[in-house]
Each structure stands twice: as C-alpha cells, then as structure tokens.
Amino acid sequence: MAKYTEAKCRMCRREGCKLFLKGDRCFTDKCAYDRRPYAPGQHGRARKKVSEYAVQLREKQKTRRIYGILERQFHGYFVKADMQKGVTGTNLLVILERRLDNVVYRLGFANSRNQARQLVRHGVFTLNGRKVNIPSLQVRLGDTIEVPEKNRKIPVLAEAQEVIARRGCPAWLEADGAAFKGTVKAMPQRDDIQFPVNEQLIVELYSK
C-alpha cells in the first residue's frame, strides 16, 4: 500500500502551518515548524509569486496531509461529497472527520492520526462490540468505539484518561477514559473542525 515517506515536520513547513502530525511533540519546543517557520530547501525563505492554482493546490495538499490520505482516495471523497445534498466543501470535511481513525484520534486514544490508523489496523478497537481493522470506515450516529480489556495495557491507551482530560474531544463525541470507550452522539458540523482550512479552495480546484 502506498504511504507518505517524507519527514512529517517537512510537511508542516511546506504547508506553512502546523498539521499536528507528530502528536504531543507539536506542542513542545522541539517542533520544527516553530523553529523554522518557512518552506524546506535551499530557497525556502525566498519570496515567490503564488498563482491562484498554487493556492488551491496547497489547500488541498494541506487537508490531505492532516488526515493522512493519498490523492486517489481524497478525490473519491470529493466525488462522494459533491453528490450529497448541501455544501460540497462542508460535506467533504464531514466525511473526513467521520473516518474511524480520525474518531479514535479525536477521542484521545492516540497522539496522532497516523498512530490511530496503526492501532485500528492492528485490531485494537471494537465498533459496536465487533472487532474492526479498517481505518477509513465511516462512523454513524450512536456508534460506540471501545478498547477490549486485553488491549488496555498498550502504553498509549493506558494514557488515554490523561490525554482526554488534557485535550478534550469535540462536542459531537463523548469520551469515557475510565471505561476506554467513546460514543458518536451527533454528526460533526463545520464549527467542530477547528484547524485552518478553506474547503472552498479545494472545491474550486477540483471543479476546473
């Protein structure tokens, strides 16, 4: 399966903002973007004339990298969002937020989406009482994500209560760190997505 091989901190510098790809490290003095907030490479500091297409492309790349999704799947999500009722850009972000690996991350069971994806692939969680290992699975209203007793000693999961208390979780989710369980109590809304993204630029890019 294809995957990103570029250093994660270089991705943040390339996109010009923190993508929070390395979990807690992004909140410390070790964050590469805080130390060098400019594009990587010899000409990273140089001022460049940016075209409309380049702005749209960067917005798409930034969003893909935040969720760790490759182009083919991301475009598939856009097609699906465009076929739904409502605003296409908002539909796209809601689809991305409803991915199981993102929900695991949002609930505080992982320090990053990449880590959440690995945990899901290893079958660490159950969805409505059944073992799942598909990171892209779309959660639904009322779904319950839980860590079985035998998996609760995994270090990152043992810290779940602390992470949930420190980071919290979105209003559309309910996390119970003591029970190693989370519930989807509503569908995500645009206001629940806090990272800086202009989804309309993505729509304009794909509509050309």
From Swiss-Prot:
GO MF annotation list: rRNA binding; structural constituent of ribosome
Cellular component aspect of the GO annotation: small ribosomal subunit
Cited InterPro entries: Ribosomal_uS4, Ribosomal_uS4_bac-type, Ribosomal_uS4_CS, Ribosomal_uS4_N, S4_RNA-bd, S4_RNA-bd_sf
GO biological process: one example: ribosomal small subunit biogenesis
Domain S4 RNA-binding residues, every copy: 98-161
Pfam families in the record: Ribosomal_S4, S4
Keyword RNA-binding listed: yes
Alphabetized UniProt keyword annotations: Ribonucleoprotein, Ribosomal protein, RNA-binding, rRNA-binding
PANTHER family: 30S 40S RIBOSOMAL PROTEIN, SMALL RIBOSOMAL SUBUNIT PROTEIN US4M
Quaternary organization: Part of the 30S ribosomal subunit. Contacts protein S5. The interaction surface between S4 and S5 is involved in control of translational fidelity.
Family to which this protein belongs: Belongs to the universal ribosomal protein uS4 family.
Function: One of the primary rRNA binding proteins, it binds directly to 16S rRNA where it nucleates assembly of the body of the 30S subunit.
Name by which UniProt lists this protein: Small ribosomal subunit protein uS4
Organism, as annotated: Desulfovibrio desulfuricans (strain ATCC 27774 / DSM 6949 / MB)
Source organism phylogeny: Bacteria, Pseudomonadati, Thermodesulfobacteriota, Desulfovibrionia, Desulfovibrionales
